[in-house]
Amino acid sequence: MVTAAAVLEHLPTLYDYFVTSFSPVLSVLGGPGHNPVLDQLLPVVQRSPLVMCALIAWAATHRAGTGHPYHDVARVSAETVEMQIDSLDVTRDFSNDEREEYMWTLIILGGVEIVRGDSKGWVRRLPMARGMLERALQSVDFKSSPTWQSLAYNTAYHDILSVMAMTRGPKWPAVYDRILNHNNVEIDGYMGATRRIFYLLTEISTLATEVAATLELPESGDKDRELTDLVAGHEALLARLRAVDIPLGVFVQLPIGTDRSHLIVAIEVFRGAAELYLRHTVLRAASSDLQCRLIAKRLMHNLRLILGTPHESQMMFPLFMAGVYTSHDAGRTEIINISTKFSERTGVRSVIAIINLLLEVWKRDPDGTLYVDWRKLAEESGVAVSFG
């Protein structure tokens, strides 16, 4: 039996594994020897035993998932961290160092669950993460703090990509407007240059929730008027989505090893995914919808351009949305093959849950002619699906 003390024996090996082998799949930026995510995370790891333990849990979970004997180390270290976080009184005042420590710990625990393949704990802790982030940014100068920019972008990224599989979106934190529409031209390691599209995804989620609630109302003139307004909201969001462009100056100071062409392609990939999500959740477009099929085909063309690059770490949500609107066998086989190879290469088991969800969609729509509410299927599956 592995004890908490015995976990420390594995610390040097697992720390080195995280830094050199696992962390490169976490960032869409940089190249060999340069990872912007590590620049902000490692200083906190080195001063905080809690974050260090969380990091060991993450690395051990990933290592165990690739066939190495670290299951007990992963379990003990994760349980130790979860016990402390779940007993935390989030209403008390924290120092800035404590805020950083607890936010990184929450995020890393989410990463542990994504590697395991089920994000229930992350979803359960999301209100805590949102609340801590909002309170922190009331007193922190976001524009001048690379650490809090990294924490904020990381939280928003994983929050949004977890909520995409829910039929009822949350009340999004007001601070996400400030985070995702930040005027500075720097790009980040989680969303690259796609932050504004992520903000639109929060608005699409809200609109989709309103559509779902309205459709449940009894037939009436008021219901018809509400649906008309919601369709108008769809048109307005679609126009804003199509107008998203790369901010001026974004290429001035790129991290070493970053390919600007991949940043441009990633914007087109996420633009296509967001439009498919908008049409699916708001207009309830069936898989036979010609416009959606054309968008999916263009999305797949762009996505192939970033396979094997750091940007593929973002690709599961776009790939899934393309799959929903792909009806021919060859296209569906390609999507499964890409997903499977990505899961094998990265050791991230959340991809398996996404593949299983897509296979269930296709099982219910074998010919590509129906509307299948995959978000409802995801909720009924009992697995918390995360595209992050």
Specify the residue positions occupied by each region the protein language model found.
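Cytosolic regulatory protein-protein interaction regions
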Residues: V2-T3, P36, V44, T167-P310, ...
